[in-house]
From Swiss-Prot:
This is Uronate isomerase. GO terms for biological process: D-galacturonate catabolic process; D-glucuronate catabolic process. The gene is uxaC. Pathway: Carbohydrate metabolism; pentose and glucuronate interconversion. The lineage of its organism: Bacteria, Bacillati, Bacillota, Bacillota incertae sedis, Caldicellulosiruptorales. InterPro entries: Metal_Hydrolase (IPR032466), Uronate_isomerase (IPR003766). GO terms for molecular function: glucuronate isomerase activity. Its EC number is 5.3.1.12. It holds the Pfam family UxaC. Signal peptide: none annotated. It catalyses: D-glucuronate = D-fructuronate; aldehydo-D-galacturonate = keto-D-tagaturonate. Belongs to the metallo-dependent hydrolases superfamily. Uronate isomerase family. SUPFAM superfamilies: Metallo-dependent hydrolases (SSF51556).
Amino acid sequence: MKRFMDEDFLLNNKTAKVLYEKYAKDMPIVDFHCHLNPKEIYENKTFKNITEVWLGGDHYKWRLMRTNGIEEKYITGDADDYEKFLAWAKTIPMAIGNPIYHWTHLELKRYFGIDDVLNERSAPIIWEKTNKVLKELGARDIILKSNVEIICTTDDPIDTLEYHLKLKEDKDFNVKVYPTFRPDKGVNIERETFIPWVKKLAEVYGKKIESYDEFLDALKSRAEFFHSVGCRASDHAIDDMVFADASFDEVANIFKKALAGEKLTEIEFAKYKTYTLRFLGKVYSSLGWAMQLHINALRNNNTRMFNILGPDTGYDSINDGHIAFALVKFLDSLEKENSLPKTILYSLNPKDNYVLATIMGSFQGGGIPGKMQLGAAWWFNDSKDGNIQQMKDLANLGLLSRFVGMVTDSRSFLSYARHEYFRRLLCNLIGEWVENGEYPYDLETLGRIVQDICYYNAKEYFGF
């Protein structure tokens, strides 16, 4: 029987161990999609205790605690931090087979030097040990300890990027922190947030926005500003993939109606989103950016809890919407104008992997290695099985060797341990193929493939 999470954790063959130790383990991290707060990075935020850094905004953990019967007061409520930590310590032993069990203990090992298993018995001593370490461990220290080279945060076009600019000038911190352009609030015309957001966009743009062409000019201007601060990617939450062709005049009228507070139809929503996303795609192409599409999430399912806690609190799920037809139409509309940017396609529904991977193959080209990417296993799929399946699906239908690799997609500074988790799974999968006689034992080639997926592909793809 193997020991729990020893140095060969998840590495089940000799080739995997060689690949991980020699080629993957020490590669820097390019975290090209996360939700870290740049202000907290700039200020080197410190954490008063392990509860703040672990449970402060982690809806992955919150879902498990609710499932374990923990009362909400110990999750997002007014219980004190130690009580919340004990509630988590009571929950985590029940998470057998869940990646959060592995992530929790990897984080204890890598950042706190703790090999103990977290449970109700060990909780008091782990509370003391972690809090002692946290006195000397700020956000920047965690990032540096994780061997991170580049971080791409997720940012609204109306953001001033104040802290990205400050970080750019900070000579004492050699990690690059770049913004990512996420204009969802300007695309989702059906939501109550749309009109207030357009007003805020006008403020940062410095000009009135009373027409659709002025709105598009403002979006382009903000993208160019983001580019000047180092942005090389956009990100879009496409919960429902739609495509409805329309003329500029049609969409301009829809925009005008929206600003006037008039009720729009579903087809008008679709026409507006299609035209606006297509315009943005052309902007991204001209800037040399990558466009990330996160598809098929079903958000804020629990209305009662949404009204109490708001979004991103653990009440989302996988959607099962049809995406192929509309996605192909959208990508093709850009390709016909030679304006399709580099694109990373993520679906929260794993049934879509083959759909996305085959669609990608229809739009590769331009002399760009892996121009169209099947995004890493995301959110509910970020597990042992989910990561392996995503890599197998990509290998079956494309080139795994051109994969840009793992992202944390996280709000937690400790989540860089997930890169180690991914790298171990990657090396084990490749090792299995080699040891099964499905690929030659050519360490030079194998090592290069591993290092490319862990680091070089992403760095070259985004042009960092």
